[in-house]
């Protein structure tokens, strides 16, 4: 999740303060912005243009949340177990060594969106997270109304979504959630959506040998795929459900592998809000998922 008004205050242009009265000339005091402050994201609820989407943007719209912090996004901080974050260019420059020191074991990083956009911070984030010793993976923000699942899987696999057995690379993620630019299900029927997702999965697996992880909410999956269970035996499931003690899993999946439990987390090395996530298992199981030995 990107930062909103709080970061706008810290990331604005330097302010000049004029002092008068006792001095003949005004004294300008420049307030420098925070070095790693993230850029200001478009407010949820408005159309999100190409390249601007991020993990959770549709979830905010689905839950009727505005631009500022909300108790449903803050929620109880579940800091137990194996912890991680997800990021995009909206988080700005990230100190990945500090993220590791803050106790984060894994990270998912936005790589692509549709078939025309590669996140401009992906390469730096992906490399620096690896060098910091964080197990990381890439995610693709789906635009099912723009092109086929096959075409988008190809674009993702060719632009950061690849996989290798190196102890630090997780399988890629298909981020498919409430359309941030229009109708919830992108104008597709449940049958069309199932086909789109299945095509994406099939092509991604053909390109990488891995089953793509699916990120979404219970509401979106039940509504837009008709509670489809066709991916349950194939894809690890990542559920977004903020501000609760336990997530609701859609009818089509028996359990969750990852849980995005907050969109307003704070982690050393990241300026402003960042999505917080939990892995459903031990550190050894996370490594097994990364290396495809689970």
Swiss-Prot record:
EC annotation from Swiss-Prot or TrEMBL: 3.2.1.17
SMART domains: Glyco_25 (SM00641)
Family to which the UniProt record says this protein belongs: Belongs to the glycosyl hydrolase 25 family.
Lineage, top ranks: Bacteria, Bacillati, Actinomycetota, Actinomycetes, Kitasatosporales
Catalysed reactions listed for this entry: Hydrolysis of (1->4)-beta-linkages between N-acetylmuramic acid and N-acetyl-D-glucosamine residues in a peptidoglycan and between N-acetyl-D-glucosamine residues in chitodextrins
One Pfam family named in its UniProt record: Glyco_hydro_25
Annotated GO biological process: carbohydrate catabolic process; cell wall macromolecule catabolic process; defense response to bacterium; killing of cells of another organism; peptidoglycan catabolic process
Disulfide bonds: 185-224
Name of the protein in question: Lysozyme M1
